[in-house]
Structure formats: C-alpha cells, structure tokens
C-alpha cells in the first residue's frame, strides 16, 4: 500500500473515513472540556492557575510525546500506533471522568499523549497512502478538526445541564474514539510497513539538522504560538475595549469557525501550484494585519477576527501540507511532523502565559498584540523559505 492507486475503492473509502474520524477525535477530546472549566474549578475548588493547567497540560504532553511518535511508528507500524493512540485517549477520558482532582489532571495528560501520537502520525500516513492527494486530504481533515472543535464546545454544556453532570458530559466524548477505533479495525488487520530499513530510519533521525525542516517547523510553530495567544486572550482583549461578555464570546466562536474555513479553499489552490511561497507569506501576513487591527481599530473586531482566523487556519493547513510535500518518505514525514509539533506546542504552551504577564506589566493589550504581529511577519519569512518546491534530503 504505497500509494492511493493501490487501494481498492472500498478500502480507500474506509481508510479516508478512519482518518477523518481520528481527526475528529483528536480535536473534540481536546476542546470539549473548555466550556466546563468554570464548573470544574468550582467542583474541585481549583485556583485560576490550576484551572489554566488543564488547558496547558495537553500542550506540554504534545511537546514531550511528539518526538517519540516516529520511532514508535517505525517499531510497530503507523496503523497500530494510531490504534494505540485511540486507546490512550479512551483511557484518558475514563480516568478524567472519575471523581478525583488528581485523576482529572492525570487523565488529561493521558489524553494529551494519545492526541500527540495521532497528530504526528496522520500526516505521515497521508504521505504514504495518498502521495498525490496530500493537500486535498490534509485540507479535509483540517476542516474536520475545525468542525469537531465547534461540535465539542457545543455539546458538552447541554449534556452537563441535562442530567449527565460535567463528569458524565466529558465521559460521553468517548463515543468519538470508540467510533474511530471501530473504523480503524480494518487497518489494524491489514497492518503493513511495520518496520523501516535501517538506512531510512537513520535518515529520519537527521531531520533536526535540516534547514528546510526547521523552516517548516518554525512556520507551523509560530502559527501555533500566535493562534493560542489569540484564542486564549481574545475575549479579554475585546472586553477591555468595551465589548460585552456575550459579544466577546460570539467573536471567540467566530474565530474558531474562521480557522476551519480555509479547509475548503486552500487545497483547491494548492492542487494547481507546486511553489507555495506566495500563498504561505500571504496568509501569514493576514495574521499580522488581524493583530494590528485588533490593536488600533478594535471597533472593527469582526473583520480582524475573521482575517486572523482565516490566516491562521490557512497557515496550519499549509504547514501540515508542507510536512507531506517536503518529506521524501512517509516515515520522514512522521519524523518531521514530530519535530514540528513538538516545537510548535512548546511555543504554544509558553505563549499565552507570557503574553498575559506582559499585559499585567503594561496594563493593556497593545504590546502583546504587536508582539503577535511581529511574530506573524517572522512566520511569513519562514513561509517563503518552507514554500519552495523541494524535498528534505
């Protein structure tokens, strides 16, 4: 199974369905707890810092576990590694739902480990089985992840309020990994490519010394940083400019929808171009303009939120597509994915608290927002480098 043409029509559909369901699981189990954080904090009398750790802990798990995903896939194969990732997520959901604050944090960390494996391995799997459809399938699963984020946020509060409680609502999220496991069973049974030749395995270990790999990594990594800064602080930024909590919440939801929209458009564009430098720089600059607009013209926050959200979502899709396009093999793609996501999520975990401290020191959001704009300009430069039509050797 080295390319999409070697898959029968039925097997191809089942594989794509499995990929999209795994993508749904990776996002919905991460974002689903966010609307219940205040309820969880009250239930366990957590401090604000402890509550914030529930959001940061998965990001730290992503950063720590991501580099291990490619070696695991070389040892056990991508199919079985993804199956194990889904089992970890199921176990984490069960542990997180038990009545103990310690198990709440422990389960959250386990979920983060499972998500990290899945995040890293999906681009490699797409590179291996759909080498001529990397952009389209990456766009499809990115769009699926965006929709899943909205679904997770929308479903847990009604469940919690209608007899399930917050623990039951979080436990109900197990439906997603269980369905993904069911759809992934055929891939477990047809397990292939469990091992990689020694020379190619050694080749993937040198990924950290490749300038092109670092350009892809920093393009994705800076986007993760600026996205998590804005997604974390946008309501506070808007409220400081006179918006109501309801208005700020609506714009926060609009931001998440805007990040999903490029999944429909970017793959169509990428299908016709081999050199992605122009589009990579353009979407990164959209993020910069959005941040500057929020800083100096907050009255037009809808425009700036849409602009930033579309730019960041498009950057993520481009970055994930670069992983497949710039890697010369499926396992090198997994290694590059692990590198990019490890660095990216480490930056993402540090960004929101750092920008929060800068805000506290200055008393306003101007410096953090201009920091996001400058970082976005730097991201555009790395996009110009990563968008060249060449592979890592």
UniProtKB/Swiss-Prot annotation:
Keyword list, A-Z: Antibiotic resistance, Cell inner membrane, Cell membrane, Membrane, Transmembrane, Transmembrane helix, Transport
Superkingdom in the source lineage: Bacteria
Segments crossing the lipid bilayer: 13-33, 53-73, 81-101, 102-122, 141-161, 164-184, 219-239, 250-270, 279-299, 305-325, 335-355, 367-387
Membrane topology listed for this record: Multi-pass membrane protein
One GO CC term, this protein: plasma membrane
InterPro entries, alphabetized: CynX-like, MFS, MFS_Cyanate_Porter, MFS_dom, MFS_trans_sf
Periplasmic face residues: 34-52, 162-163, 240-249, 300-304, 356-366
BP terms from Gene Ontology: response to antibiotic
PROSITE patterns named among the record's database cross-references: MFS
Induction note: Repressed by NimR.
Ranges facing Cytoplasmic side: 1-12, 74-80, 123-140, 185-218, 271-278, 326-334, 388-393
Record's subcellular location: Cell inner membrane
Molecular function as annotated in GO: transmembrane transporter activity
Disruption phenotype: Mutant is sensitive to 2-nitroimidazole.
Function: Involved in efflux of 2-nitroimidazole.
Family according to the record: Belongs to the major facilitator superfamily. Cyanate porter (TC 2.A.1.17) family.
Protein name: 2-nitroimidazole transporter
Gene, per the UniProt record: nimT
């Amino acid at each position: 199974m080295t390319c999409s043409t070697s898959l029968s029509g039925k097997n191809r559909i089942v594989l794509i369905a499995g990929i999209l369901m795994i993508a749904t699981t990776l996002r919905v189990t991460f974002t689903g707890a966010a609307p219940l954080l205040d309820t969880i904090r009250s239930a366990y009398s957590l401090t604000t810092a402890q509550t914030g750790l529930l959001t940061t802990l998965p990001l730290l798990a992503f950063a720590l576990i991501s580099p291990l995903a490619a070696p695991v896939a070389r040892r056990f194969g991508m199919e079985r590694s993804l199956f194990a990732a889904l089992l970890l997520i199921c176990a984490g959901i069960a542990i997180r739902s038990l009545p103990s604050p310690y198990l709440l944090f422990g389960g959250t960390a386990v979920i983060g480990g499972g998500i990290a494996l899945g995040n890293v391995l999906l681009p490699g799997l797409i590179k291996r089985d759909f080498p001529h459809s990397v952009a389209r399938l990456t766009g499809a699963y990115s769009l699926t992840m965006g929709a899943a984020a909205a679904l997770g946020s929308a479903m847990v509060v009604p469940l919690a309020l209608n007899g399930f409680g917050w623990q039951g609502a979080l436990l109900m999220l197990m439906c997603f990994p269980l369905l993904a496991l069911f759809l992934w069973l055929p891939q477990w049974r047809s397990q292939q490519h469990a091992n990689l030749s020694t020379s190619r395995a050694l080749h993937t270990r040198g990924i950290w010394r490749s300038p092109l790999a670092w350009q892809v990594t920093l393009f994705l990594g800076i986007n993760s940083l600026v996205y998590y800064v804005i997604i974390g602080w946008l309501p506070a930024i808007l409220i400081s400019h006179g918006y109501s909590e309801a208005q700020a919440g609506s714009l926060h939801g609009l931001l998440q929808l805007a990040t999903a929209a490029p999944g429909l458009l970017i793959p169509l564009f990428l299908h016709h171009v081999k050199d992605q430098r122009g589009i990579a720089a353009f979407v990164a600059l959209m993020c910069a303009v959005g941040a500057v607009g929020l800083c100096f013209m907050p009255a037009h926050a809808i425009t700036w939120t849409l602009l930033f959200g579309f730019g960041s979502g498009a950057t993520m899709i481009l970055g994930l597509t670069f992983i497949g396009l710039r890697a010369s093999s499926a396992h090198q793609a997994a290694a590059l994915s692990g590198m990019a996501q490890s660095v990216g999520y480490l930056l993402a975990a540090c960004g929101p608290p750092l920008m929060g401290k800068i805000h506290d020191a200055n008393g306003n959001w101007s410096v953090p927002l201009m920091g996001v704009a400058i970082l976005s300009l730097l991201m555009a430069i790395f996009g110009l480098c990563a968008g060249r039509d060449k592979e890592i050797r």
